[in-house]
């Protein structure tokens, strides 16, 4: 075992039939932690079902099914290694809640890999007004995903095959769109690939000898190393709370910022419940401290399971503890709402792990979403494609933070009619001081 590689998270985005599953499956298959025996059994099963063409996507389908069926979240299956990084694929797209997951995502992606269908008609469908290519790229940028890699996929099926002119045409059009969204297209590699045949995924392909840039694997290796927010105060949104016989109450979640360690006195927002952390575990091993990105369970003393809920946030009681938000102001982009959104609108907000109805109390301004310039003060409504600053009031106690200070707790999806109608980033929060919150004996001793 050499030195542990740096971990990065990747989100794979793009239109429905662009080949996301095949490309992701291929990487995991060739570079990943899937046991060869497992793959052979998949291959056999795929062949029996005449799904040979689907081999790589099939890998992902099997993994998805296993992930949905079992409670064991074997994240190792979603990993692959480059020379420099250990990469985790955060969410396998194609999921109905993909956009919601991307926002509340258990994690901030370090890089978005945008898969484009280069075939005749395929590219046009993806980039059209209704296609998801634009929406996903805009989302990635709004949510602070710094790096973007574009894969011009299905190069084996262009007319003629492996067509340079088709590649050039796509690069030109996608670059101009990415520029509108906010990315610098000169910093975005465009890699012509075939996720199915394997061209330029890992090794250079002689079919594409006109292309001199990096392969997909090399492009991933060239991502700048991300900075991790371990210096910030602790924020750990709870995903679940378990009662474990002989141990007690164990909240589970992902450290978003800061560190958590045994002996620390934590305060849970929004209620202000304060207690001592007895132990911290990851993958059944005790930790001396857990860092941002770690999915952990931690044991707390004298706290009933009913006192903690999904969406609560653990924080260090001595370092900017988490508090309930009385109201907050956010920059919101309306993505797919059939009508007009005006003051009083009360959809559900998905922010980190919480899922709470929030009232749009006051639409303060309408802005140009690219430049941020104000277009109109106190507009009557916002509609599709509009962006604006909105003051919001939660209908139940919830914890949110500014995007600038705690990014994962400062971005949200607005859900209505079973879809994501808008996304937002929080600019300012007015907090409530907790009243009458329970402080356990263990925590008092520590004071």
Swiss-Prot record:
For the region G4, give the residue spans: 153-156
InterPro entries cross-referenced by the UniProt entry = EFTu-like_2, G_TR_CS, GTP-eEF1A_C, P-loop_NTPase, T_Tr_GTP-bd_dom, TRAFAC_GTPase_members, Transl_B-barrel_sf, Transl_elong_EF1A/Init_IF2_C
Top-level division of the source organism's lineage? Eukaryota
Entry annotated with the keyword Glycosyltransferase = no
Q: Report if keyword Kinase is assigned.
A: no
Name of the molecule in the record: Elongation factor 1-alpha
Family, similarity comment: Belongs to the TRAFAC class translation factor GTPase superfamily. Classic translation factor GTPase family. EF-Tu/EF-1A subfamily.
Q: Which SUPFAM superfamilies match?
A: EF-Tu/eEF-1alpha/eIF2-gamma C-terminal domain, P-loop containing nucleoside triphosphate hydrolases, Translation proteins
Q: Which residues form the tr-type G domain?
A: 5-230
> What is known about what this protein does?
This protein promotes the GTP-dependent binding of aminoacyl-tRNA to the A-site of ribosomes during protein biosynthesis.
Record-level GO cellular component terms: cytoplasm
**Positions contributing to GTP binding:** 14-21, 91-95, 153-156
Where are the N6-methyllysine residues found in this chain? 261
Its organism's taxonomic lineage begins at: Eukaryota, Viridiplantae, Streptophyta, Embryophyta, Tracheophyta
Q: Which residues carry this modification: 5-glutamyl glycerylphosphorylethanolamine?
A: 289, 362
Q: What are the GO MF terms of this UniProt record? A: GTP binding; GTPase activity; translation elongation factor activity
The gene it comes from is BLT63
